[in-house]
Regions:
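Jelly-roll (double-stranded beta-helix
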Residues: 1-213
């Protein structure tokens, strides 16, 4: 979140897709009650949110802090480490959500993209495609139909697995469909989906409500 100093310490090699917003990024309103608690039909719950871990061994000595201001980054040198604290107070802190904890919503026939929604902001939404059962009506066609997002640019980052509607898309690939451009499953993928029971895919989709510059 804006105005909070944070640091990621990966256990292994890490590649990151960064999504930045000038407006707050939050859980979808339809997943919450009037008090902000996630409801039972939400595809994830508060227990899935991972909070920071304090590591005192890192909080020593002088340190450089990179601060993003508008479209630039400035470096500030702190004489004392900002993590040299006992803890934090309040509810404003960095957090993590593992896409593997997203519980997919499925149906007898093909469900619309909003069932995959994970986060929302003023000008875009973030969706998670995860391993799930395919549509289970006897006559269902699991592959999505061709469509055109009249008011949205669509970006999909393919994290892992075999994406149900694409061919030749490898791990860490990105596809981009500008608003108004008709698109859908590649040739043969619709027929291939008929009779399939499940999909094994991990992907993150960003649908914007303004054109991407």
């Amino acid at each position: 979140p804006r105005g909070v100093i944070w640091k990621i310490i990966p256990d292994d090699k890490l590649k990151i897709l960064v999504i930045e917003s000038r407006e707050p990024i939050e859980t979808p309103k339809r997943y919450r009650n009037e008090f902000g608690q996630l409801l039972e039909h939400s595809p994830f719950c508060e227990r899935d949110i991972v909070t920071p871990k304090h590591n005192p061994s890192l909080a020593t000595g002088q340190v450089d802090v990179m601060v993003k201001l508008s479209d630039g980054i400035q470096k500030y040198t702190y004489l004392h480490h900002p993590f040299d604290v006992v803890g934090w107070d309040g509810y404003y802190y960095p957090y993590a959500f593992n896409i593997s904890d997203f519980m997919p919503i499925t149906g007898k026939i093909h469900q619309p993209p909003p069932v995959h929604q994970t986060f929302q902001s003023k000008n875009f939404v973030v969706c998670s495609f995860v391993p799930r059962l395919f549509d289970y009506h006897p006559n269902s066609i699991p592959a999505p139909y061709a469509h055109s997002n009249i008011d949205s640019d669509e970006i999909i980052y393919y994290v892992d697995g075999d994406f149900m509607s694409r061919k030749g898309v490898k791990k860490e690939s990105i596809t981009y469909h500008p608003m108004g451009l008709p698109h859908g499953p590649q040739p043969g993928k619709t027929e291939e989906s008929i009779g399939a029971k499940e999909t094994n895919e991990f992907a993150v989709m960003i649908d914007t409500f303004k054109k991407i510059n």
